[in-house]
Amino acid sequence: MTTIMIAVLAIALLATLFGAILGFASIRFKVEADPIVDQIDAILPQTQCGQCGYPGCRPYAEAIANGDSINKCPPGGQATIEKLADLMGVEAEESAHDLEGKVKKVAFIHEDMCIGCTKCIQACPVDAIVGGTKALHTVIKDECTGCDLCVAPCPTDCIEMIPLETTTETWKWQLNAIPVVNISEANPNSATSRDQNN
């Protein structure tokens, strides 16, 4: 019984010692991140699609902080370019990708050809494809960014990019863009003057 207690005590002592060493090392060898990179990364849409030429949003944020162009993110669009220009103190540029007149496209899986290999699921950076191994897959069109990274890995070519028609149901309404002001609260004197005139 005493040998078990000695072994448990020795393991606890070693765990405490290694924990203290790791704690000290994490403080002593801490790598400071550039705060501008974190701010740029927060503005980017985090689709990790690679259309900018970088493997994800964080590497692109680091490249922008080092002087790369701010107009390479198609999912972010012009709004992201303007936010980045404001943050970086530069003039907003037009998108490097010709998005004028282009209809947004989303992936569509022809389910009769799908073999359930899950290669498209692994390639999708935003988890817009659902399905399981040896089961049919489908695309959640509201989540799809149209990056077409899922098309190339498909061994049966059952994925195609189809245009998403803009309707009143699919339009991205920006309800906060137009401020709603209650006139009676905005100008309380006008209500009392109307009452006095009557």
Curated annotation (Swiss-Prot):
Domain of life of the source: Bacteria
Positions that bind [4Fe-4S] cluster 1: 49, 52, 57, 73
Pfam families the record matches: Fer4_21, FeS
UniProt subcellular location: Cell inner membrane
Residues annotated as binding [4Fe-4S] cluster 2: 114, 117, 120, 154
EC number(s) stated in the UniProt entry for this protein: 7.-.-.-
Annotated positions binding [4Fe-4S] cluster 3: 124, 144, 147, 150
Cofactor(s) needed for function: [4Fe-4S] cluster
Entries under InterPro entries matching the protein: 4Fe-4S_dom, 4Fe4S_Fe-S-bd, 4Fe4S_Fe_S_CS, Elect_transpt_cplx_RnfB/RsxB, RnfB/RsxB_Proteobac, RnfB_subfamily
Keyword Translocase: yes
Domain 4Fe-4S ferredoxin-type: 105-134, 135-164
CC per GO annotation: plasma membrane
Residue ranges annotated for the 4Fe-4S domain, each copy included: 32-90
Assembly behavior: The complex is composed of six subunits: RnfA, RnfB, RnfC, RnfD, RnfE and RnfG.
UniProt similarity note: Belongs to the 4Fe4S bacterial-type ferredoxin family. RnfB subfamily.
Protein name: Ion-translocating oxidoreductase complex subunit B
Organism: Vibrio vulnificus (strain YJ016)
Gene name per UniProt: rnfB
